[in-house]
Amino acid sequence: MQHRDNPEKAPLSDAPTVVEDRAADYRHASVLLDGAVEALMTDPDGCYLDGTFGRGGHSRAILQRLSPQGRLLAIDRDPAALAEGATWDDPRFTLRHGRFAELDDIARDAALHRRLSGVLLDVGVSSPQLDDASRGFSFLRDGPLDMRMDPTQGESAADWLARVSERDMSDVFKRYGEERFARRIAKAIVARRGERPITHTADLAELVKAAHPAWEKGKHPATRVFQAIRIHVNGELDQLEAALAAALESLAPGGRLVVISFHSLEDRLVKRFIRDKVRGDTHLPRDLPIRDTQLNRRLAMVGKARRPDEDEIALNPRARSAVMRVAQKLG
């Protein structure tokens, strides 16, 4: 989907030319694009950080609204995303290789620690990653069972399945996939790997399908298992928790934190983080007179959680489960 610019948000006439929109080449549409960027950008002259560059959908929209004095720092650990960003020619834009959990260190290196006007995190796997069979994220396309966000680092899904105990495998399926039949599926996988290695996505998908006794309507039986393995292999929830804390440290007072998540585990983590920072130090004695400043409230909520409307879902069905939450750092 090509992004249609709002005329009121058009690039400034003297701003550098924004990189050509090549999102269509990847059949990828950034979810909640306009809403996220509008919530993020309180100052066109500010410094912003896109913690999940992907194929640049959000970064491109930020640059379109950024003045010549503004600055955008983006991060990604996917080599394909880095290759896309390397083609961009805009003096306001810098792309760094790294995990979004490292964003405070990356911001420090760029002399932007506590100077950021906004941090955007678009969490989870991207459409280009799902659509590329060689990455091993999707049960709909046969390919090597990899699932790593950065294929140059860490253990692949196939390697993990080959060595993990049945009990630990079941725990991962239950914790990260909320899979009711985790034990049954883990047992089937362990039995199969005793006969031959499970190395491809189609092998795993068919195995889970055969072992699953009750399919959810409209959902492939392997959906939850693939999600669980991907989250575990990439340490996604630990990374997200660290990224939220790092974002809070990197923001300037008044800076915005915008997070888009795609499943309940992510959203619960984000919701809890924002809620706790809005409430402040709730462990202080309730029977003592306490000034508001003593509560050490770090964030203020900005609006309610937002979901894509039906028009966006019709254009991009993968947006259906997205939730966006916005908070502002207090001084």
Swiss-Prot record:
Which annotated residues bind S-adenosyl-L-methionine?
G56, G57, H58, D76, F100, D122, Q129
List the catalysed reactions: cytidine(1402) in 16S rRNA + S-adenosyl-L-methionine = N(4)-methylcytidine(1402) in 16S rRNA + S-adenosyl-L-homocysteine + H(+)
Molecular-function GO terms, alphabetical: rRNA (cytosine-N4-)-methyltransferase activity
Q: What is its EC number?
A: 2.1.1.199
Look up keyword Hydrolase and say if it applies.
Answer: no
Q: Which Pfam families match?
A: Methyltransf_5
Q: What does this protein do?
A: Specifically methylates the N4 position of cytidine in position 1402 (C1402) of 16S rRNA.
Q: What is this protein called?
A: Ribosomal RNA small subunit methyltransferase H
